[in-house]
């Protein structure tokens, strides 16, 4: 994903200086220090190699998400990167928090949201409850105009295929489900077109149809 993230750094509004990246391991907050530290280390090392100034901010629970110093650190970023873990927990901690409000201000001034796995899933309108095989879901931020964002799509085991069927059955007219393959990203702006970047494909499903987009192809959401 080096090419994708290099593109994000080149288009984050840094205006000739080193881009500032904040990595948030929040989605792994229930997994213990070892997991949080692993996600933080991977993010810092990755973006440092790409030439950015990077800091991992230890937002792992409601208290740290409302820490004013953490919120201030996020607000100084050009790229806010949410790593993987539990999307429901990530949404629970971020909702109405000072850190989330700071992140929103970053994007409003032209900065970049980057999300891995859980970090991408919270951008749709809902996150499926995998234990209920898609029959239940939890409302999330709805930033991107699609009902569900499903990462690791090409690695979906056969046993989870009924989940996709259940989610598609729940889609209403005009709603979509966006599946993104591993080592692949969908990059765009709200209200504009989205481009597939990385190594594989993105898949856009409606209740009755589907389209697959290869690297370099563009499409619209919510239209």
Where do the protein language model's features map onto the residues?
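Conserved beta-strand elements of the Class I
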Residues: 20-22
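General beta-strand structural signal in soluble alpha/beta enzymes
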Residues: 55-58, 81-82, 113-116, 177-180
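A short helix-to-beta-strand connector/capping loop
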Residues: 50-53, 109, 173
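C-terminal and late-domain segments of enzyme folds
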Residues: 1-18, 27-41, 45-48, 127-129, ...
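Portal/gating segments that form or line small-molecule/metal binding sites
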Residues: 28-85, 89
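Class I SAM-dependent methyltransferase SAM-binding "motif I" and its flanking Rossmann-like core
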Residues: 83, 89-159
């Amino acid at each position: 994903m080096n090419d994708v993230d290099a593109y994000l750094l080149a288009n984050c509004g840094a205006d000739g200086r080193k881009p500032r990246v904040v990595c948030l391991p929040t989605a792994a907050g229930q997994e213990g220090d070892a997991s949080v530290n692993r996600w933080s280390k991977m993010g810092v090392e990755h973006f440092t190699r790409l030439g950015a100034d990077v800091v991992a901010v230890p937002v792992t629970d409601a208290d740290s998400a409302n820490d004013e110093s953490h919120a201030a650190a996020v607000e100084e970023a050009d790229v806010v990167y949410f790593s993987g873990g539990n999307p429901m927990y990530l949404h629970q901690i971020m909702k109405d928090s000072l850190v989330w409000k700071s992140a929103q201000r970053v994007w409003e001034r032209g900065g970049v949201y980057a999300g891995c796995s859980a970090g991408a899933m919270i951008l749709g309108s809902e996150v499926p409850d995998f234990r209920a095989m898609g029959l239940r879901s939890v409302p999330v931020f709805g930033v991107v105009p699609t009902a569900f964002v499903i990462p690791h799509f090409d690695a979906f085991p056969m046993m989870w295929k009924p989940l996709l069927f259940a989610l598609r059955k729940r889609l209403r007219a005009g709603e979509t489900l966006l599946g993104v393959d591993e080592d692949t990203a969908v990059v765009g702006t709200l209200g504009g077109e989205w481009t597939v970047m990385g190594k594989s494909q993105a898949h856009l499903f409606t209740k009755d149809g589907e389209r697959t987009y290869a690297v370099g192809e563009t499409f619209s959401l919510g239209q």
